[in-house]
Amino acid sequence: MSVVNFYGQLSNTQQFDQIRINIASPEQVRSWSFGEVIKPETINYRTFKPEKDGLFCARIFGPVKDYECLCGKYKRMKNRGITCEKCGVEVTVSRVRRERMGHIELAAPVAHIWFLKSLPSRISTLLDMTMRDIEKILYFENYVVVDPGLSILQKGELLTEEELQKAKDKYGEDAFTASIGAEVVQQMLKELDFPTLKQELYEELQNTTSEVKKKKLVKRLKLVEDFLESENKPEWMIMNVLPVMPPELRPLVMLDGGRFATSDLNELYRRVINRNNRLKKLIESKAPDIIVRNEKRMLQEAVDALFDNGRRGRAAKNANKRPFKSLSDMLKGKQGRFRQNLLGKRVDYSGRSVIVVGPELKLHQCGLPKKMALELFKPFIYSKLELYGIATTIKAAKRMVEAEKPEVWDVLEEVIREHPVLLNRAPTLHRLGIQAFEPLLIEGKAIQLHPLVCAAFNADFDGDQMAVHIPLSIEAQLEARVFMMSTNNILSPANGRPIIVPDKDIVLGLYYLTLAFDHEVGEGMMFSDLTEMEHALYNKFITIHTKIKYRRNQLNAEGKIVPVIVDTTYGRLMVGELLPSNPNIEYKFINKPLTKKDISLVIDLVYRHCGQKATVIFADQLMKLGFKYACSSGISFGMDDMVVPKSKIVHIDETQLEIKEFEQQYSNGLITYGEKYNKVIDAWSRCTDRVANDMMKEIAKPPVSDDSNQQKINSIYMMAISGARGSFQQIKQLGGMRGLMTKSNGQIIPIPIIANFKEGLTVFECFNSANGMRKGQIDTALKTASSGYLTRKLVDVAQDCIITEKDCNTDKGIEVKSIIEGGEVIAPLAEMILGRTAAINIYHPVTNDLILTKGELINESKLEQIESAGLDRIMIKSVLTCESSTGICAICYGRDLATGSLVSEGEAIGVIAAQSIGEPGTQLTMRTFHIGGAATKGAEVSSVEASYDAKVKILSRNVVINSEERKIVMSRNCELLLLDNNGNEKAHSKIPYGARLLVDEGDMVTKTQKLAEWDPYTIPIITEKSGKVLFKDMVEGISVRDVTDEATGIPSKVIIESKQYSRGAELRPRIQLLDAKGEIIMLSNGLEARYYLPVGAVLSVEDGVQISVGDIIARIPKESTTTKDITGGLPRVAELFEARRPKDHAVIAEIDGRVEFGKDYKSKRRIIINPVDGSMGLEYMVPKGKHVVVNEGDFVKKGDLLIDGNPVLQDILKVMGVELLASYIVKEVQAVYRLQGVKIDDKHIEVIIRQMLQKVEITDSGGTTLLVGEKIDRREFDEINEKAIKNGLRPADAQLILQGITKSSLQTRSFISAASFQETTRVLTEAAIAGKVDKLRGLKENVIVGRLVPAGTGFFMDKMRKVAAKLDEENA
């Protein structure tokens, strides 16, 4: 027995390592066939036997019954292999009817529709004709000149019937050859001489300058090369013989009423056979040409319908006007072969039922109803009954089980012991949606689930159902126990935080238990023993909330027990007793009212320091304690617990006064409608927050009462603050005010709902709020699908990302630093580098001690060292820079978040990344409607405050002092840094153009001091010189318009789009500043003082007035506010991963230099950047309506925005490189999720980005056979270049290209994976022509061909098989 077979699968499947797809030649089709199908008949409707030579013929396809010929002469096994001389049927198993094929010899050649119609059409590309022309030839509309002979006609020219006749008259019958139909196309394809054609095309490509022609030639050349490499013949795209599928795969079944249900394929095949037979007869009887031609066309159409119904012309329909399901439809889409049967199979040994809560279960257990267990474990029970001699045969055992005899239950108990079962809750959005448990037999019909795993399954008990699956083989049981047991899945793979965390009532119980109240009975007593305390509690000398002192034994760092006196309560000590003893887990972590966050932190600590077993026991005990006290605390709430603050009326009155003022300003024309709208929204947002804060303060206060029985703390407050249920958002609506509502388009209605639910809403308010609620409901319905689709695309693009080796030994890495926005640290450095590996040796900046060596994992203890060293940026390894030839190496990936240690080889990190990004998306779309449409938008940021006591440093400081002696920022990229005493950066903020600076360089500031302020709703245009205003190119009604506000009647001048007027095209509205002599003033940068005004700018000055430095001459209103929620977010995530161009995208400066405005061109503005060194400048043409954020003479850096908006990802890649592109995508995606409080580790997003950057575009082919403009896999490109260098040729040059995830999935190296994703026919057509080989490296293709996936345990089996094969070769 060879070593290979030792590791082979048990079934006798063929051993293969790769799969190749090709175009089938007619000879191949005939060799597959077991006979020709001549008749269109299926079965005889009287005898129900298949007709001879028909579509179900037993002679061709095999016997209908096992080991029995059709006429019944030969029966049973003994005659196996004999062919009956009477009916011609071979005596064998009927299973062969699933694999034996037939064929139809076509009377006329027929084009394969995939190669004709699947874009780009391969036949037309090869023949260099348009697809329309080829169709005209194939469908007998036009003739084509094959050989011009003596005429002046061109080869390949099309002629209609009349034109042909004229040409014949003109040149004579035999002067030239013209023909029609598939025969002529086949002949033309046959005549192609590929080597010569390749040479010609290559030369033409070198000589042509036209870009369009180049593209066309590259496409054609690529196709010719594909044919040459794959050894396919082009004439095979036209078929002379048609394969017939095995009959069992297109069955004909009898229904109850004697009618038959048949597969559509039979109907389609019948049409082909009918037309083919008719055509044969017509040709034999020498029918007129026109009739034969018509029949040939009909045959072509019948074959088209069989292969891809509806691709060309009208689809063939059945009697009920439904289109027939063709072969292509069998493969395509969710119901196709790939996704329905190969990637998703129905599973035997499974059951499903409703779930109920099982609080008395241990974490590794689940309750399984006896009835279900009996059914699921039947085979095991049978064998045990037989083994113990309780039943003599399997049949007897079966009867015993059906009768439910008492012994059966005893055997079931034994069978079930330590046999894990898998529980799955749909939708399975991440890998924690399927976990293994040990079953406990229970009465009833519902499955019992442990409360702590609900978060992972996202399960609740309002009628959810779950499925049970039984792992049968010992290996499957082992894997279930080792990898999938609920006790082994404590941490979430998305972020490495514990996912087995108490929730809801457990949290409430623990919070209540750990509360401490003043003036409780027995305050200040001292205890040294828990039993003594229990005694005191029992006799009512203390309560669980009494503040007491207690002597507690604690482990110190050396591991010795030290007694410590702690101020605590009995309740907290009960939690303390559960803590495992470890010096790192101090009592202080639980010596406070425990909220959900605190409990999560403690569980995390226990896991990190005491391991998994201790964590599981601790979590289980916590749960029991929490439930007990949630029950005995008797927490509930009534109407009176919702407190409406007294200050509410005051705040509302104040805000209404404020709004009156805005209305007044608007009436006076000081602000536009948009500005007023924004200010009103802001005012109401602030008011709502104030009311909510006051309400919170009142709720948090203990009730003032002498009644000792009254609860000391408000129940609603307790639920919210502990994180058990409800958010402050919701409480605000119960007792504060509901606040602003959103319209269905995301806009905020500027009239708030002043009432809360306790007071009740007025009819008008109720109507207003219905709008938002409906939005929530609709969002949930519509967005769930798009989120699921995003997850599918992500899984598809990343499915072949597997950890294949320990270390790729690269020196590359990426630099990370903490993300600071608006002076606030949003993502601290520690969070970003935990669980990653160092790319270089890292030293302490002061003492120069080595903190981390290259390739070392950064764990919690190393983090502390890095933080104490004050390092603010670090080089870490990343999957983006990993240089493994296949897959990714463990060192570049870092920690496996689900285990907390270095990732192991064979881990399918791509799928985990996709699930981690996709799962919260689905969750968040469902979360919208819980808040009920209340607008969740904070007031706009209009100032920046110091977050520390620090020293100010200002970068790009360019300031003017205006007439009010205020410092106005004139720089577009001014940044304000706060430095500590060592000069390390503590915070930095961008200060927008036009802001008032309240501090200056070198000032010392204190925490919360205001540093700068600005108007968040407009972008001002400010003068830096004083002078007289002169309007230029402002033509009333063409480039500027007096807009009179309907509500106020006050006019203001607004710049409008002028390109629709003939004389407006040249206008460039601007304001110039003149000095006393009437000459134009020069600015400090040597340019004239002229300010170009974009469309939509509102003028703040009149023509001819005198203005001073720092005055606003115009303002550009910003968009009015809409709410921010994940709906805005999910499409944004999809946009980033699909690498789409954003709608109003920014333009990025590609070089450093000074800005100059050139001459406009039609409706575009010309922006020129002139480098400082005087080399050639770069021009950008931007639409006039866009807001240009730079002014003439500004200095811009590479990567700065010239126009507002989201930058195009491809531009970032081109200008700033891979590292900055990656950090931009990571930052943007994280911003969406962070807004919803969802934590995802950066490395997951990086894995997806790596997959988007797989391809390069050839810019120079060097000495290789690559073509310029060809897109090819990065690794393939490196391999080709290595070969070229070895052979002494010049290597090719290429640039990295970014592809969206859909495109990336479709261009993956595996055609099986791509075909099962989308556009199945296109992918298969392309693969067949190129004769592609699938190496079966990814997960998907292995699932499809029915093998173990090369990840996890399968990775090692794969490795062993390869080693074994090598040994076999050596031994041979």
From Swiss-Prot:
Gene Ontology terms, MF aspect: DNA binding; DNA-directed RNA polymerase activity; magnesium ion binding; zinc ion binding
Record-listed Zn(2+) 2 binding positions: C808, C882, C889, C892
InterPro entries per the UniProt record, alphabetical: DNA-dir_RpoC_beta_prime, DNA-dir_RpoC_beta_prime_bact, RNA_pol_asu, RNA_pol_N, RNA_pol_Rpb1_1, RNA_pol_Rpb1_3, RNA_pol_Rpb1_3_sf, RNA_pol_Rpb1_4
Enzyme class: transferase
Entry note: cofactor: Binds 1 Mg(2+) ion per subunit.
Residues involved in Zn(2+) 1 binding: C69, C71, C84, C87
An annotated GO BP: DNA-templated transcription
Enzyme Commission no: 2.7.7.6
Catalytic reaction(s) noted: RNA(n) + a ribonucleoside 5'-triphosphate = RNA(n+1) + diphosphate
Subunit and partners: The RNAP catalytic core consists of 2 alpha, 1 beta, 1 beta' and 1 omega subunit. When a sigma factor is associated with the core the holoenzyme is formed, which can initiate transcription.
Function: DNA-dependent RNA polymerase catalyzes the transcription of DNA into RNA using the four ribonucleoside triphosphates as substrates.
Protein name: DNA-directed RNA polymerase subunit beta'
Organism: Rickettsia bellii (strain OSU 85-389)
Source species taxonomy: Bacteria, Pseudomonadati, Pseudomonadota, Alphaproteobacteria, Rickettsiales
